[in-house]
Protein backbone atom coordinates (compact mmCIF):
# COMPACT_ATOMS: atom_id res chain seq x y z
CA UNK A 1 0.00 0.00 0.00
CA UNK A 2 2.49 2.62 1.17
CA UNK A 3 5.10 1.64 -1.42
CA UNK A 4 2.46 1.80 -4.17
CA UNK A 5 1.75 5.40 -3.15
CA UNK A 6 5.47 6.13 -3.44
CA UNK A 7 5.43 4.64 -6.94
CA UNK A 8 2.54 6.96 -7.86
CA UNK A 9 4.61 9.88 -6.61
CA UNK A 10 7.57 8.88 -8.75
CA UNK A 11 5.42 8.38 -11.83
CA UNK A 12 3.90 11.83 -11.33
CA UNK A 13 7.30 13.43 -10.78
CA UNK A 14 8.60 11.72 -13.95
CA UNK A 15 5.64 13.09 -15.88
CA UNK A 16 6.34 16.63 -14.69
CA UNK A 17 10.16 16.66 -14.54
CA UNK A 18 11.10 13.97 -17.07
CA UNK A 19 14.58 12.49 -16.66
CA UNK A 20 15.38 14.83 -13.75
CA UNK A 21 13.11 12.68 -11.55
CA UNK A 22 14.90 9.43 -12.44
CA UNK A 23 17.97 8.80 -10.30
CA UNK A 24 19.29 6.07 -12.61
CA UNK A 25 19.68 8.60 -15.46
CA UNK A 26 21.20 11.71 -13.83
CA UNK A 27 21.88 10.66 -10.26
CA UNK A 28 20.06 11.71 -7.12
CA UNK A 29 18.60 15.23 -7.22
CA UNK A 30 16.83 16.11 -3.96
CA UNK A 31 14.49 18.74 -5.43
CA UNK A 32 13.13 16.43 -8.12
CA UNK A 33 13.02 13.13 -6.22
CA UNK A 34 12.23 13.96 -2.58
CA UNK A 35 10.23 17.18 -2.63
CA UNK A 36 7.51 15.78 -4.95
CA UNK A 37 6.97 13.01 -2.39
CA UNK A 38 6.49 15.53 0.42
CA UNK A 39 4.12 17.62 -1.69
CA UNK A 40 2.10 14.55 -2.76
CA UNK A 41 1.68 13.25 0.78
CA UNK A 42 0.77 16.70 2.11
CA UNK A 43 -1.91 16.91 -0.59
CA UNK A 44 -3.09 13.37 0.19
CA UNK A 45 -3.45 14.25 3.89
CA UNK A 46 -5.41 17.35 2.89
CA UNK A 47 -7.82 15.26 0.82
CA UNK A 48 -8.18 12.64 3.58
CA UNK A 49 -8.93 15.37 6.13
CA UNK A 50 -11.44 16.96 3.75
CA UNK A 51 -13.18 13.59 3.37
CA UNK A 52 -13.20 13.06 7.16
CA UNK A 53 -11.18 9.85 6.99
CA UNK A 54 -8.18 11.09 8.99
CA UNK A 55 -10.45 12.49 11.71
CA UNK A 56 -11.92 9.01 12.23
CA UNK A 57 -8.47 7.40 12.41
CA UNK A 58 -7.11 10.02 14.82
CA UNK A 59 -10.28 9.91 16.94
CA UNK A 60 -10.04 6.11 17.22
CA UNK A 61 -6.38 6.19 18.24
CA UNK A 62 -7.01 8.99 20.72
CA UNK A 63 -10.00 7.20 22.25
CA UNK A 64 -7.98 4.01 22.82
CA UNK A 65 -5.00 5.84 24.33
CA UNK A 66 -7.24 8.04 26.51
CA UNK A 67 -9.00 5.00 27.96
CA UNK A 68 -5.78 3.09 28.64
CA UNK A 69 -3.61 5.95 29.94
CA UNK A 70 -6.29 8.13 31.60
CA UNK A 71 -5.10 11.41 30.12
CA UNK A 72 -7.14 14.25 28.67
CA UNK A 73 -8.77 13.81 25.29
CA UNK A 74 -7.47 17.08 23.86
CA UNK A 75 -3.80 16.35 24.44
CA UNK A 76 -4.19 12.77 23.21
CA UNK A 77 -5.98 13.92 20.06
CA UNK A 78 -3.18 16.36 19.25
CA UNK A 79 -0.49 13.74 19.88
CA UNK A 80 -2.31 11.18 17.70
CA UNK A 81 -2.76 13.76 14.94
CA UNK A 82 1.01 14.42 15.08
CA UNK A 83 1.56 10.85 13.88
CA UNK A 84 0.05 11.75 10.51
CA UNK A 85 0.36 15.50 10.10
CA UNK A 86 3.09 17.89 11.10
CA UNK A 87 3.96 19.67 14.32
CA UNK A 88 2.28 22.89 13.25
CA UNK A 89 -1.00 21.36 12.03
CA UNK A 90 -1.67 18.88 14.86
CA UNK A 91 -2.57 21.47 17.54
CA UNK A 92 -5.13 22.94 15.14
CA UNK A 93 -7.22 19.80 15.67
CA UNK A 94 -7.86 20.97 19.24
CA UNK A 95 -7.74 24.75 18.78
CA UNK A 96 -10.88 25.49 20.86
CA UNK A 97 -9.30 23.86 23.93
CA UNK A 98 -5.79 25.32 23.84
CA UNK A 99 -6.61 28.49 25.80
CA UNK A 100 -7.99 26.45 28.73
CA UNK A 101 -5.30 23.75 28.84
CA UNK A 102 -3.11 23.03 31.83
CA UNK A 103 0.67 23.45 31.64
CA UNK A 104 1.09 19.69 31.56
CA UNK A 105 -1.24 19.40 28.56
CA UNK A 106 0.56 22.17 26.66
CA UNK A 107 3.93 20.53 27.28
CA UNK A 108 2.48 17.23 26.03
CA UNK A 109 1.36 18.89 22.79
CA UNK A 110 4.83 20.39 22.30
CA UNK A 111 6.59 17.10 22.97
CA UNK A 112 4.14 15.28 20.69
CA UNK A 113 4.98 17.59 17.83
CA UNK A 114 8.69 17.02 18.28
CA UNK A 115 8.37 13.25 18.73
CA UNK A 116 6.76 12.63 15.34
CA UNK A 117 7.42 13.45 11.72
CA UNK A 118 4.81 14.53 9.22
CA UNK A 119 3.49 11.90 6.81
CA UNK A 120 5.11 13.56 3.79
CA UNK A 121 8.53 13.63 5.41
CA UNK A 122 8.10 10.01 6.51
CA UNK A 123 7.37 9.08 2.90
CA UNK A 124 10.46 11.00 1.78
CA UNK A 125 12.59 9.06 4.28
CA UNK A 126 11.17 5.77 2.99
CA UNK A 127 11.98 6.80 -0.57
CA UNK A 128 15.53 7.86 0.28
CA UNK A 129 16.35 4.88 2.50
CA UNK A 130 14.75 2.30 0.21
CA UNK A 131 16.23 3.67 -2.99
CA UNK A 132 14.34 2.29 -5.95
CA UNK A 133 13.80 -1.16 -4.44
CA UNK A 134 10.13 -1.74 -3.49
CA UNK A 135 11.08 -4.49 -1.02
CA UNK A 136 13.45 -2.17 0.84
CA UNK A 137 10.89 0.64 0.74
CA UNK A 138 8.25 -1.66 2.27
CA UNK A 139 10.75 -2.69 4.95
CA UNK A 140 11.55 0.91 5.91
CA UNK A 141 7.92 2.04 5.63
CA UNK A 142 6.79 -0.67 8.04
CA UNK A 143 9.44 0.19 10.61
CA UNK A 144 9.20 3.98 10.37
CA UNK A 145 5.41 3.94 10.58
CA UNK A 146 5.52 1.55 13.54
CA UNK A 147 8.02 3.80 15.32
CA UNK A 148 5.89 6.86 14.67
CA UNK A 149 2.75 5.18 16.04
CA UNK A 150 4.58 3.85 19.12
CA UNK A 151 5.87 7.35 19.79
CA UNK A 152 2.32 8.54 20.61
CA UNK A 153 1.92 6.76 23.97
CA UNK A 154 5.64 7.23 24.68
CA UNK A 155 5.14 10.97 24.23
CA UNK A 156 2.43 10.98 26.87
CA UNK A 157 4.56 9.00 29.32
CA UNK A 158 7.60 11.28 28.96
CA UNK A 159 5.49 14.44 29.12
CA UNK A 160 3.75 13.30 32.30
CA UNK A 161 7.09 12.40 33.89
CA UNK A 162 8.46 15.86 33.06
CA UNK A 163 5.31 17.76 34.08
CA UNK A 164 2.77 15.70 36.02
CA UNK A 165 -0.85 16.80 35.79
CA UNK A 166 -1.67 19.00 38.79
CA UNK A 167 -4.80 20.69 37.46
CA UNK A 168 -8.12 19.39 36.22
CA UNK A 169 -8.10 19.07 32.41
CA UNK A 170 -11.27 20.24 30.68
CA UNK A 171 -11.39 17.13 28.47
CA UNK A 172 -10.28 14.43 30.92
CA UNK A 173 -11.52 11.09 29.62
CA UNK A 174 -13.32 12.64 26.63
CA UNK A 175 -12.14 12.69 23.03
CA UNK A 176 -13.54 15.53 20.96
CA UNK A 177 -12.12 16.62 17.67
CA UNK A 178 -13.52 19.76 16.14
CA UNK A 179 -11.74 20.54 12.89
CA UNK A 180 -13.03 23.54 11.01
CA UNK A 181 -13.85 22.78 7.39
CA UNK A 182 -11.59 25.21 5.54
CA UNK A 183 -11.87 23.51 2.16
CA UNK A 184 -14.80 23.62 -0.23
CA UNK A 185 -13.99 20.55 -2.34
CA UNK A 186 -11.25 17.99 -3.01
CA UNK A 187 -9.40 20.33 -5.39
CA UNK A 188 -9.33 23.01 -2.69
CA UNK A 189 -8.07 20.47 -0.15
Map each language-model feature to its residues.
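Interfacial loop/helix-cap signal at membrane boundaries in integral membrane proteins
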Residues: 1-37
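Short amphipathic alpha-helical coupling elements at transmembrane boundaries
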Residues: 3-7, 56-70, 82, 96-99, ...
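Alpha-helical transmembrane segments of polytopic integral membrane proteins
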Residues: 8, 12, 41-45, 50, ...
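Cytosolic juxtamembrane amphipathic/interface segments immediately preceding
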Residues: 16-26, 65-66, 90-100, 180-188
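Hydrophobic alpha-helical transmembrane segments of multi-pass integral membrane proteins
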Residues: 29-51, 67-87
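Alpha-helical transmembrane segments
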Residues: 38-42, 140-158
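Alpha-helical membrane segments and immediately flanking helix-loop junctions
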Residues: 68-129
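Long, contiguous bundles of hydrophobic transmembrane helices that form the permeation core
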Residues: 149-188
Amino acid sequence: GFVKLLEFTQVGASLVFGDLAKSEKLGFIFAFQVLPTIIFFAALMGVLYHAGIMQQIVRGMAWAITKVMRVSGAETTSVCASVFIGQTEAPLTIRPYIAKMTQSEILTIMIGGMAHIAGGVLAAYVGMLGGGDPVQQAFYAKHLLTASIMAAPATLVIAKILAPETGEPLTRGKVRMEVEKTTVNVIDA
